[in-house]
Amino acid sequence: MASVQEALAQLLTVDGAMCAALVDSTSGMLLGSAGSGLDLELAAAGNTEVVRAKLKTMKSLGLNDSIDDILITLGTQYHIIRPMAQKEGLFLYLVLDKARSNLA
């Protein structure tokens, strides 16, 4: 089984990848990171709030489902949040340079 750092390094091989992180969504704590371009500790805490807000909204709507991923499109970047199905409470966070990546 690959280590956290090896897995994050593998994510950075995606075209346009700038940085990646593994985040504990119960605490907002950064468990591992790779790459550069953002303050990943700050991003981990902020994106934990995004995940929590979506889960709360889903519960309020009575949606008995799970989040596959959350895509946030900025002017120059894509931010992808992907909860880990096999490890509840953790999510992967990947930042892509929009000009150098392709979501297809």
Please provide the spans of the model-predicted regions:
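Non-catalytic interaction/Regulatory regions outside core domains
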Residues: 1-104
